[in-house]
Amino acid sequence: GICVVSYLSKIERGSAEPDMAILKQLFARLGINYETDSAFLTESRKQMDEFFYNLQYGLENETVWKKLAGKWDRLLMSPLTIDIRLVSAIYYSESAWKEVDKSFIESLMKKEADGNDIQNFLNENVSTLVRLEDCMDEKQYAYYSLVCSRLTKDPAEKMEWYQKVQHGLQNT
């Protein structure tokens, strides 16, 4: 069966790659609708790659963010969950120095968003990313480090995070 302990253990340790159909079955048993539509995931991956490219070169990301924000619920329950959380954390971590689109936060909160709502969303999102840190690849960890560098107030800690960003992105 799909819940054989040794198979699940191999997946947890990263020594086995689960088939998407098996993942979908596992999540279904937990009552979660896991997103496996390859066309949707491919399109979303391209949009996330565009977001990260724009970020690296200082280009506008509003349009890409709005497309991805519209897919938030589906992406959270997909293999791209870390990436969409990174995209949203990066986007909203910029709110300290530039105007950001609050409509996504408003739709989550079901009311007009203010700075505290953005901060609460960021805190919750970063808290989840902290728990997912061991699952991140080098590039994801670099973007996670970027978020952490933006959110910390301590200059020494900020520099440590920036060095992790630089190290992680120089290899991509």
Regions flagged by a language model, labelled:
Residues I11-E12, I22:
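DNA major-groove recognition helix of helix-turn-helix
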Residues G31-Q47:
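Short C-terminal boundary/hinge segments that cap the last helix of small helical domains
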Residues E60-K71, K98-A113, N125-M136, A156-G168:
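Alpha-helical repeat scaffolds
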Residues D49-Y53, D83-Y91, Q119-E124, Q140-C148:
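"A position-specific structural signal for the A-helix of alpha-solenoid helical repeats
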Residues G1-K10:
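Short alpha-helical DNA-recognition segment
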